[in-house]
């Protein structure tokens, strides 16, 4: 394919900030390069859908959505991983000729945003209720305009390339319209219903869906209470972890087949302190083997009791209000906060003789995922999406219409969907999408996409809108298609979205997100996309794991191990940070982020920079592989290895094996090109121009992972500057089309012979001396002229002789591809043998000692884990050294 030359005049912006040449600085300065290049890329529109128009292939489209971060948020290390992976795929597809859309945007984050603004107002002594709903919402919008774009600007520092001109917000006008349409359609289809249900209730944030409740282990108490029979001194004992809710008991239940209590069914008990009468009932829900086999029933404050209450038509008594304060049903305790009331209630029960015993007890306590408050089961009138709306999405996932990466997440998805319940979508907040349902004084209820002027039934104007807002995840569930114009009306048409977007970009090609929101977000997008567009929203779903510290611990402020990605970028550069995250990201495994790997990545950028400088010492500029065909043996060899790199890298990226792709790049660029290609060129200067062309082409491969240094070195090696040239990011991605296995085999022997000769000379303490001759036993068919071109120069040998049998009086080094023999006729080997034998003896003792300790069961049982790990590492190192000495001795002794 012809290479793209200089940019069109529209891409030559005289106002672009010049990038300081690296010759004017001390080494590679990523900070300067990154800021300057990013401005040029964004100004030229490269990130947009038509940014690569000149290389786009017909009917090749790629779409990926940014999981919209909270508008309140700032970039954390999980974002950095997620955005890096998305950007790698986006840049790869863009260079490969796809019309590419990476859709950016932010989420209005109902609870989080309202909390932030409420706290700001409270710091000024203002409560939101004093302002009223409309004035408060104005304050939220003001805050959003001031601070809501922070995370998007931080994303730029990571080198990401979304279509910024299309940035959406889940409460922009178009998405408001989309949300209203989705709600009304589901409402009219009977999939959205309203009713009194038991919900998870946070006294601060209101109703929560099941997956918004996080469960923590709690060391509490189990209170055994005496419930006396009516007009009797006899009693039964029931247990509870929440004595403050017993005021809502409306029965005690036993198993209908439990002979111990059959005679008690139907008898009347009297509740302690308040004297209300309840009956003993029979229900098969009771586990006869657990505790006493008698269970108190509190239908308004326990989800299982709620179902029992419905079966037996029990009274549902709510004992505290929405703020968590006990009501009149609690008698003298009315007005106390539910958790603070516990101590007073228990004290009173003890005083009156109603406590049988109190035991220590560990249980799981549900807490609000936002504020950490203890969540209560609470009966409330709420809006729900019926679980049946998800059924077709489940079927289509299991028919293979979308694939999970790693594949095991499909099992997790199915397991969760099997237990799916109706989704509570109403929230008692002011900030968010207000539920588009209206209530008229005439009693009529209806849903409308637009604000109505009158009641459609009585034509009257005395109506009001439901005060609740939708769960934030409702609007996020529409993200893969609402951002493409579905339900937007005319809002944003031609700027945020285009007429053809749904046809070109739905279903999205790929979703990349964390596994932790599989159920919050991914499952809901699947069901909404299937329901409204009759197609799953993604072809592939890649779920990455957590980023942990180098010890494998989850990051938390309390541990002090939180890593700020912006600090990493400042210290190591954007490219090094991205490359580290990618090379550590193996499918299904947590990312263990370490300073050691970051240093390795930083050294990698310096290695590349130094390689380019070496090439430029020999030529002022280099062409590309589109313009020249390698002719020298070294050029052909490196071109063949480059082609293998292309093949393996494409395979890794197409399978979302980001770590494998990074490893392929590292192996080729450092291990093959820098370590060997440049080294071998010292004996073959004619290959320099070809190596320069290959290195430039390799920068295209590197670009999705390390966009800045790849751009810089590509331009620099071409004798150009980005200000006057087309960016590497819209040049065609290389294809694998050049393999020469025979020449690869020859150079493998050459390199192996150089390594073996150097190793043998070092063993014989001749490393810096030039020796007259080395004998090589190699596979047949080797090009003798090539062997004599490279080995003598790089191994410091006068001559090479190929042979088929081992010569007499020689020491040997057996490599992977050949055997090297060096004559010992003129050498006294006894001091070397003596030294190596002493080393062998010392190392053997060390290995035996460590093995003895690690095989000692008592030592292993009592030693700290870090000591055991240190000993295992020491054993591995000692064994490696011992094996090396043995090989050297064997080679010398023949």
Swiss-Prot record:
GO terms for biological process: valyl-tRNA aminoacylation. Catalyzes the attachment of valine to tRNA(Val). As ValRS can inadvertently accommodate and process structurally similar amino acids such as threonine, to avoid such errors, it has a 'posttransfer' editing activity that hydrolyzes mischarged Thr-tRNA(Val) in a tRNA-dependent manner. Signal peptide: none annotated. Residues 832-894 form a coiled coil. Belongs to the class-I aminoacyl-tRNA synthetase family. ValS type 1 subfamily. Its main location: cytoplasm. Monomer. This is Valine--tRNA ligase. Keywords: Aminoacyl-tRNA synthetase, ATP-binding, Coiled coil, Cytoplasm, Ligase, Nucleotide-binding, Protein biosynthesis. InterPro entries: aa-tRNA-synth_I_CS, aa-tRNA-synth_Ia, Anticodon_Ia_Val, M/V/L/I-tRNA-synth_anticd-bd, Rossmann-like_a/b/a_fold, tRNA-bd_arm, tRNAsynth_Ia_anticodon-bd, Val-tRNA_synth_C_sf. ATP binds at residue 557. HAMAP family: Val_tRNA_synth_type1. Residues 1-28 are annotated as: Disordered. A motif ('KMSKS' region) lies at residues 554-558. It holds the Pfam family Anticodon_1. It comes from Wolinella succinogenes (strain ATCC 29543 / DSM 1740 / CCUG 13145 / JCM 31913 / LMG 7466 / NCTC 11488 / FDC 602W) (Vibrio succinogenes). PROSITE patterns: AA_TRNA_LIGASE_I (PS00178). GO terms for cellular component: cytosol. ValRS has two distinct active sites: one for aminoacylation and one for editing. The misactivated threonine is translocated from the active site to the editing site. Its EC number is 6.1.1.9. SUPFAM superfamilies: Anticodon-binding domain of a subclass of class I aminoacyl-tRNA synthetases, Nucleotidylyl transferase, tRNA-binding arm, ValRS/IleRS/LeuRS editing domain. Residues 1-22 have a biased composition (Polar residues). It comes from the Bacteria. A motif ('HIGH' region) lies at residues 69-79. One of its GO terms (molecular function) is aminoacyl-tRNA deacylase activity.
